[in-house]
């Protein structure tokens, strides 16, 4: 598939903007996947190429959070293992079953997350009581978070952040940092399976990855410096935008 230099430049910018937003609030795939599909790329290859570029952004943001000691891998290694396994299973299943019913339910889930953050203004301002240990979170929650990202994906960052706030008691910047490390892990598992299936356009993926790395690094810095004032409105806005796009794509507004 031949992609011109002008289109590659646009995709570089798309990767930058999407990863900047994704590092703060999630929802970057809302931008990158339609952009890839508009190039005429087959859907499966669009998903595989998107996982490649998303890995660059997720890794860049994750390394930044690790350098700033916002995340301690010794605490969450068990969580990451189960996120990886869940994502691998989700990626395998998405290639073999009908997801029509799931797609109809998903907008309500994403909308609920946005409304939850909107109407609980103090949620995540400070660390709260931890409801689940890291071990139980890894066993009971992580597989489903990874499965969702591998199976479908939109809003994964927001869902992971909400789980960290409500179940692990993290403040919002800390939850966002941990969600990004989990998201990188799930992307890695999904990418590996798309790689085995040959569903990646490398040139496009690497160009978008370059933009993604720059955007994610800038977004991660914003989380650490302006987290409490920036993350909540971004999560709410992206949740509403994802909901609107999903219901539009399903034809709810087509008369």
Where are these regions (language model features)?
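Cytoplasmic-side transmembrane-helix entry/capping segments in multi-pass membrane proteins
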Residues: 73-82, 106, 129-135, 177-182, ...
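Selected transmembrane alpha-helices and immediately adjacent juxtamembrane segments
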Residues: 1-42, 127-176, 206
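Selective hydrophobic functional segments
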Residues: 48-101, 187-234
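Residue-level signature of the transmembrane alpha-helical core
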Residues: 12, 16, 20, 51, ...
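Hydrophobic alpha-helical transmembrane segments in multi-pass integral membrane proteins
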Residues: 144-154, 190-198, 242-255
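Transmembrane helix exit motif
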Residues: 60-70, 107-132, 241-255
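Residues within membrane-spanning alpha-helices of integral membrane proteins
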Residues: 8, 51, 107-110, 114, ...
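Membrane-interface alpha-helices at helix entry/exit sites of multi-pass transporters
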Residues: 41-50, 73-78, 169-180
